[in-house]
Amino acid sequence: MIVLDTNVISELWKAEPDRAVLAWIDAQMIETLYLSAITVAELRFGLAAMPAGKRRTIFQNRLEGEVLPALAGRVLPFDLDASRSYADLMAQAKTSGKVIGKADGYIAATAVAHGFMVATRDTSPFEAAGLDIINPWEPA
């Protein structure tokens, strides 16, 4: 099972998404793909911070009308198990001299709590958290 990081969803919304990312997404079985509630929060914040207009409306419709319905039942909450994983992985990263941002830490902890990997372009914080990662921008 794979948790999609925010940058994967954002890439799909570009006027010309990276072909490798499109090919990777197309090769996945939809039921193996998940989002973290933190990713949804990041996407919603990004949209709320955009100037009002057609572009923002299009992206809001994509998130609320396409992405979330397609992943219904597969948006993972940040719960008590994730909070335990967060504390452990952030402490381990700090001890190792590695830095993980809070949002990436929450996403990583959610994935760890469920035994999932993360698909992302920004691999370093998730590697620092000890997760198995997939970079859809790179050939397999």
Swiss-Prot record:
Domain PINc: 2-135
Pfam families cross-referenced by the UniProt entry: PIN
Required cofactor(s): Mg(2+)
Binding site for Mg(2+): 5, 104
Record-linked CDD domains: PIN_NgFitB-like
Top class in the EC scheme: hydrolase
InterPro entries on file: PIN-like_dom_sf (IPR029060), PIN_dom (IPR002716), Type_II_TA_system_RNase (IPR050556), VapC_family (IPR022907)
One GO MF term: RNA nuclease activity
Keywords: Hydrolase, Magnesium, Metal-binding, Nuclease, Plasmid, Toxin-antitoxin system
E.C. code: 3.1.-.-
Domain of life: Bacteria
Family membership noted in the UniProt record: Belongs to the PINc/VapC protein family.
Function (record text): Toxic component of a type II toxin-antitoxin (TA) system. An RNase. Involved in plasmid stability.
Protein name stated in the entry: VapC ribonuclease Y4jK
